[in-house]
Amino acid sequence: MKKIYVLRHSKSSWIDLSLGDFHRPLNSRGQTDGPMMSVYLSTRIDMIDFLHCSSSVRTYETSKYFIERIKFIDIQYDESLYHSSSSEIINNIKCYDEQYNSAMIIAHNPGLTNLINEISDISLDNLPTTGLVEINFDCTKWSDISIDNSTVVDIKFPKQLK
């Protein structure tokens, strides 16, 4: 079985308009929701094999909350995840090392919402910031993941934990 945790970055700040989109940090809500969601996930699991994270400032900052509480065997910050389409994200997933059975992806919308809608049997209008979706795939190779072998195990949004 393969397992993916799809997480949209926490809420980012628009205060400093001189910063480009890639460089925007988390705002105060993001700095609250990130730790809250990482605590939630750490009560369910203690390890994920691979963290694949966009290298933008807000995704990097979000990832740190999860790294503090969950063990990752390998971590990769990847600029190609910044505003990737769902098909680009799926292509990345299908190339994950087969030694990994679980992976967390921290990236951006609309790519993540579209990804969830394409590889699972649920339909989301919008994955909110710090929204988490856990999907199991009944297969042994990342290249075999599809909507036909997926099961959504958990969906959690910050507002559900407040």
Please tell me what each predicted stretch does.
Residues 3, 7-84, 127:
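Active-site-proximal alpha-helix that buttresses catalytic centers in soluble enzyme cores
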Residues 4, 98-107:
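Generic beta-sheet signal
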Residues 44-46, 96-101:
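Glycine-rich phosphate-binding loop signature in dinucleotide/nucleotide-binding domains
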Residues 62-66, 89, 115-116:
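Hydrophobic packing residues within well-ordered alpha-helices of enzyme cores
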Residues 76, 82-83, 144-162:
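Functional cleft and adjacent loop/helix regions within the main domain
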Residues 83-93:
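Short alpha-helix plus adjacent loop in nuclease-associated cores
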Residues 96-99, 109-130:
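Non-DNA-binding regulatory cores of transcription-related proteins
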Residues 122-153:
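Domain-level recognition of soluble alpha/beta enzyme cores
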